[in-house]
């Protein structure tokens, strides 16, 4: 919706005055003089033009209020169509998996002192012939699993 330009009410007022067709000699004359030739119809037209000026001057504010109401109505969160678990905020299901993996990793770190973590996290597929522990994240800086095993912290 385009806003009206600020000079539009001024142009409307000039148009209304031009429509009155006031005969003059170039000098301003008082309107109270009955010899001007102004009749009631022309004065009513002038009053109508000026009465339309006020709503046009506040129209940008009305448009802004309508826009704010629209944003308020449509920016609210919609009600869920299915029940949502209260423990989790509404996120992608893979994000729930990432949280579970992080919990598992923390348990492994806590159990490291007891020596059971390596047993729980060994590869169990056909490619793992040695039963090496797998990493949730790959080793960095070009290190291998064997390099990690040799470094005893």
UniProtKB/Swiss-Prot annotation:
GO BP annotations, alphabetical order: neuropeptide signaling pathway
Q: Which GO terms describe its cellular component?
A: extracellular region
Q: Does the keyword Secreted apply?
A: yes
Please state where this protein is localized: Secreted
Q: Which residues form the signal peptide?
A: 1-26
Propiece span(s): 27-69, 70-105, 106-108, 144-153
Positions of post-translational Asparagine amide modification: 141
Keyword set, alphabetical order? Amidation, Cleavage on pair of basic residues, Neuropeptide, Secreted, Signal
According to its UniProt record, where is this protein mainly located? secreted
Please give the superkingdom of this protein's source. Answer: Eukaryota
Query: InterPro entries recorded for this chain?
Result: Neuromedin-U_amidation-site, NmS
Q: Which family does the record claim for this protein?
A: Belongs to the NmU family.
Q: Function of this protein?
A: Implicated in the regulation of circadian rhythms through autocrine and/or paracrine actions.
Protein name (record): Neuromedin-S
- The species this protein belongs to is Homo sapiens (Human)
Q: Which gene encodes it?
A: NMS
